[in-house]
UniProtKB/Swiss-Prot annotation:
Listed name of the protein: Cyanate hydratase
EC main group: lyase
EC numbers, comma separated: 4.2.1.104
Encoding gene per record: cyn1
UniProt-listed GO biological process terms: cyanate metabolic process
Keywords for this protein: Lyase
Record family assignment: Belongs to the cyanase family.
Catalytic activity, as annotated: cyanate + hydrogencarbonate + 3 H(+) = NH4(+) + 2 CO2
Biological source species: Aspergillus oryzae (strain ATCC 42149 / RIB 40)
Cited CDD domains: Cyanase_C (cd00559)
Amino acid sequence: MSLATLDTSQHPNLPSASATLFKAKAAKKFSFEQIAQHIGRNEVATAAIFYGQAKASPEDITNLASLLGIPQEVLEDQLNGFPDRGKSVEMPPKEPLIYRLYEIVQNYGYAYKAVLNEKFGDGIMSAISFSTKVEKETDADGNNWAVITLRGKWLPFSRF
């Protein structure tokens, strides 16, 4: 199985914890799924911690340090602040898979908005009260399909 790694020269905007975490992940040969199971988080949420896009709880830090063999004090120091979200990807993205996700929003964003507004009214889907997961499906012909679920709390706009 191939594992996600990080070339820090290609990602200069990531926090120092990213390099620490990815180096230990590669050394231990763990997938995000394996790490997520150990720390009790979703694999996408776990990967988001590695990329500096999600806040690690004290328990996450303890469990990551133990699993990956990183001194806990180092991780506490590197993961102690609040994430500076949204800086890790240039816009529009150049990485092909990330660009396809961007392209989905470009092509279907207004369609999603229209359908969501019809179903829920005027508002937005939260990316804070939010969860996501990635699943793999194989059809009868043996083709693999990526299934990405986005689940966000509906937040109606306030009238004032």
